[in-house]
């Protein structure tokens, strides 16, 4: 709550030389660092170095938070100052890619054995139209990440992103053999979406698909705790789900 009201945002806003390093989009409760500014990207990379140097970590992982809005006002002034010869959308894609690259380089500058990965939205199109995350570039070129773990939190019959087709799309994008694909699975949906509620064992089936596929290096569950702390515990349903997952792994 401090960061929402009087924290990071106010610290930057009080300094005239940081006019738009932190922005708060209209209707948003949060302050957001502006990735269009090189100083902001450096600040984030420095934070990663601090973690890697001072803590015994195996990796650095970031979630699907990139641009919080499509509104031009968020970084319009920086775009004007940049005199970019590309569209605002393409410029934002470049900003996020520069940020991701700087994090990767920061990690490797400390210890090349520390891995860096990202868990972007599973809906590929949303990454481009809403988040300005150039996931295809990161999956194809070296120097951005070691693994990608898209949030493929969809059932097989999802109207927009059915699981099998979405997984296949991600597999086609990961063309760099040095980058591992880890499939994110939405355990939290077991009591939130009809397909998961009406059909036992969907997560277990998805695990089997991923492990038998040959193009994925593994899977991640979001959130693992959901198997034990969430939802209606009557009827033994969650016990059946956990047993099905266990069976899929053995």
Please provide the spans of the model-predicted regions:
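Alpha-helical scaffolding within the catalytic cores
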Residues: 101, 122-139, 160-174, 202-206
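Substrate-binding cleft of secreted/luminal carbohydrate-active enzymes
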Residues: 142-160, 170, 177-250
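Polysaccharide-binding and catalytic clefts of secreted carbohydrate-active enzymes
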Residues: 13-141, 153-154
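Single conserved hydrophobic/aromatic residue that forms the stacking wall/gate
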Residues: 1-12
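Short aromatic-enriched loop/helix-cap "lid" or pocket-rim segments at secondary-structure transitions
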Residues: 9-10, 72-74, 231-234
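Surface-exposed amphipathic alpha-helices with a cationic face
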Residues: 6, 100-112, 168-177
């Amino acid at each position: 709550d401090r960061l929402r009201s009087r924290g990071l945002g106010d610290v930057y806003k009080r300094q005239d030389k940081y006019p738009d390093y932190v922005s708060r989009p209209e209707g948003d409760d949060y302050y957001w660092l502006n990735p269009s500014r090189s100083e902001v990207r450096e600040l984030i990379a420095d934070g990663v170095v601090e973690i890697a140097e001072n803590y015994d970590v195996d990796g650095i992982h970031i979630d699907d938070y990139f641009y919080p809005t499509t509104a031009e006002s968020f970084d319009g002034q920086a775009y004007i100052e940049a005199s970019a010869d590309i569209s605002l959308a393409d410029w934002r894609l470049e900003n996020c890619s520069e940020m991701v690259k700087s994090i990767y380089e920061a990690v490797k500058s400390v210890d090349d054995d520390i891995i860096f990965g990202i868990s972007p939205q599973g809906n590929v199109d949303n990454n481009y139209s809403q988040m300005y995350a150039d996931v295809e570039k990161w999956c194809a070129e070296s120097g951005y990440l070691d693994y990608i773990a898209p949030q493929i939190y969809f059932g097989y019959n999802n109207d927009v992103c059915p699981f099998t087709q979405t997984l296949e799309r991600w597999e086609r994008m990961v063309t760099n053999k040095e980058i591992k694909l880890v499939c994110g699975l939405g355990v939290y949906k077991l009591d939130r979406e009809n397909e998961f509620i009406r059909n036992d064992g969907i997560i277990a089936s998805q695990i089997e698909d991923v492990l038998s596929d040959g193009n994925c290096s593994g899977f991640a569950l979001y959130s693992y705790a959901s198997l034990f702390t969430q939802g209606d515990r009557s009827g033994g349903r969650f016990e059946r789900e956990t047993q099905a997952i266990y069976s899929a792994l053995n």
